[in-house]
Amino acid sequence: MPQLQPHRPGAVGLRNTPIAGVLLTNADIDHALGLLLLREQEPPLVIYAADETRTALEWIDSVLVKFSGIEWRKITAEFQSLSDSIGFRMIKLPRSVAFQFRDTKSGATVLFAPSVGKLTDELRDAVHTSDVVLFDGTFWSEDELTAVRPGARSAHEMNHLPIRDGSLEFLRQSPARRKVYTHLNNTNPILMPGTRERAHVEQAGIEIARDGLEIVL
């Protein structure tokens, strides 16, 4: 995306980035490795994360201190400022967190919940009070991985609520004006045009995230 490309006019450093900070939902290795790609950030890279996530990623401090360094910031269940016009809060989940963002000027809200192992009461409330919902669409079924790799963990064991028997009907009833499945695993059949599974999702009024997707509130 052009807005995120380095070496913009007025930028400090040839490999600098307009990314002002990173919000981590958990300490998955995919997230940690992504932080290393931002090592040339100036000034220090700002990371918002739960205490458990920061503890699990202590090792990355010793790596990035030789480059940009890290400025850790705590997250809370109350709305806190992210920028002049955006506030956000944490929704605590088992083994992860979700984030709800709010445009302080328009009042519009967005929920980002890519790792949902359980539909908690707090998460249900956040879904029903958000204008846009980006929700965990990692797996279509509970045993999706075992079908291609015997012995693999189930969806719930990997902290993901499957679509078919978990989130589809729940999101169908959500009043959000846009609902989007994100964090899709490459085994998920909803990625393939023309599949029965994709049709079920689309008939429920739920979008399927794609590369380069932009959402305007």
Regions found by a protein language model. Give the residues of each.
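Metal-dependent catalytic neighborhoods of phosphoester/phosphodiester hydrolases
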Residues: 33-42, 189-197
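Divalent metal-coordination and catalytic microenvironments
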Residues: 4, 26, 47, 88, ...
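Core dinuclear metal-dependent hydrolase active-site scaffold
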Residues: 1-11, 74-128, 211-217
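Histidine-centered catalytic micro-motifs
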Residues: 22-32, 179-188
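Short internal beta-strands
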Residues: 20, 45-54, 134-136, 180-182
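Cap/insert and terminal regions of metallo-dependent hydrolase folds
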Residues: 107-109, 117-212
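Pre-active-site segment of Zn-dependent metallo-hydrolases
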Residues: 1-27, 33-41, 119-126
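Flexible, acidic/histidine-containing loops and adjacent segments that form or flank the divalent-metal
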Residues: 43-97
